[in-house]
């Protein structure tokens, strides 16, 4: 469910049309995107936009209640993983609701992206910098 204004029309539309428990994926430049899933490709050059900047933009717009990440993310890219966790914890404070964190293998994560309404590709080149957000409600 949508919260605020977002400049990217395609991304704004996807967020505005999410129902409760619908999912979107924000991914690094290398994650394979299923053919049947809508691709919103924001990547310009390596590192632009960053994973974190994209997450911030989406969190400013989308109410989330659940998060799925690959187990490998925390192990291989701990700094970026911690930055994401900090943003999620801040989101919990802002919305006053608990956000569920789940971890799966990277292979299971890739399969799970097939259930996403859209996959948002960033220019991030940090390994395993991928997250699935499950839509919550603002009420």
UniProtKB/Swiss-Prot annotation:
Task: Report the GO molecular function annotations.
Answer: D-ribose pyranase activity; intramolecular lyase activity; monosaccharide binding
Q: Where in the cell is it found?
A: Cytoplasm
Which residue positions are annotated as catalytic?
A: 20 (proton donor)
**Pathway membership:** Carbohydrate metabolism; D-ribose degradation; D-ribose 5-phosphate from beta-D-ribopyranose: step 1/2
Q: Where are the transmembrane segments?
A: none
Keyword annotations: Carbohydrate metabolism, Cytoplasm, Isomerase
Q: Do you know which InterPro entries this protein is assigned to? A: D-ribose_pyranase, RbsD-like_sf, RbsD_FucU
Record-linked SUPFAM superfamilies: RbsD-like (SSF102546)
Q: Does the keyword Cytoplasm apply?
A: yes
Instruction: Tell me the Pfam families matching this sequence.
Output: RbsD_FucU
Q: Which domain of life is it from?
A: Bacteria
Main site of residence? Answer: cytoplasm
Q: How does it assemble?
A: Homodecamer.
Recorded protein name is D-ribose pyranase
């Amino acid at each position: 469910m949508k919260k605020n204004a977002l400049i990217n029309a395609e991304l704004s539309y996807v967020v505005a049309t999410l129902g409760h428990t619908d999912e979107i994926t924000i991914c690094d430049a290398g994650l394979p995107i299923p053919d049947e899933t809508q691709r919103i490709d924001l990547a310009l050059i390596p590192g632009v936009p960053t994973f974190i900047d994209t997450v911030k933009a989406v969190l400013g717009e989308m109410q989330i209640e659940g998060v799925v990440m690959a187990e490998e993310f925390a192990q291989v890219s701990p700094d970026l993983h911690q930055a994401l966790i900090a943003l999620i914890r801040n989101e919990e404070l802002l919305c006053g609701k608990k956000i569920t964190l789940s971890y799966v293998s990277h292979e299971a994560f890739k399969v799970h992206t097939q259930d996403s309404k859209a996959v948002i590709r960033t220019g991030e080149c940090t390994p395993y910098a991928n997250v699935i957000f499950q839509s919550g409600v603002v009420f």
